[in-house]
Amino acid sequence: MNCSQAYVAIDFETADSRRDSACAVGLTKVRSGEIVDRLYGLIRPPRSRFSPFCVNVHGIRWSDVKDAPPFREFWIENAGFLEGVQFLAAHNASFDRSVLGACCTMAGLPAPSLPFVCTVDLARNLWSLRPTKLPDVCRHLGLDLNHHHAGSDAEACARIVMAAVAENPRCLAPFGV
């Protein structure tokens, strides 16, 4: 990875099992190996019924998001956050990529065409960690985490990429970055 590359770590929390139900998003922007910006927002999902399972995970309820902007409004208002970045990073990237794609589709917006780096795969490949849940990787690296708060999860993910690149600057090559 070129040291001057910029990326955004992203994390979603969802209201139910459907991928278009984002109710919170955290984004952490990194440029030249330093965190330069953070964004956290609550999002009003398309349905008011929250899965008890999801509420138990992240603690967000309809009453917390009923006055929040829907995804389309939030994403358009904050579109500039992704300007100049070369990739997105997420822990279990297939989940966050699918949430972003489903929310963009539902909102009639194009999904970003940036490659995703998965920090689960980084942790397995670089440090041979098992298990690779976010708290496990953070504990291994000595990182603070308020798990299932999208802002904290996104920052932890950004710091995992930073640690991986510091240890092996070529570790992102398998992701096409």
Q: Which ranges hold each PLM region?
A:
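Buried hydrophobic packing segments
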Residues: 100, 122, 157-161
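Conserved catalytic/binding loops enriched for acidic/polar residues
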Residues: 153
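Acidic two-metal-ion nuclease catalytic site recognized across multiple nuclease folds
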Residues: 1, 158-177
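Beta-strand segments within the central parallel beta-sheet cores of soluble alpha/beta enzyme folds
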Residues: 114-118, 175-177
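Conserved non-catalytic scaffold segment of RNase H-like nuclease domains
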Residues: 1-113, 128, 135-148
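P-loop/Walker A phosphate-binding loop and immediately adjacent motor/lid segment at beta-alpha junctions
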Residues: 113-114, 170
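Short alpha-helix plus adjacent loop in nuclease-associated cores
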Residues: 116-133
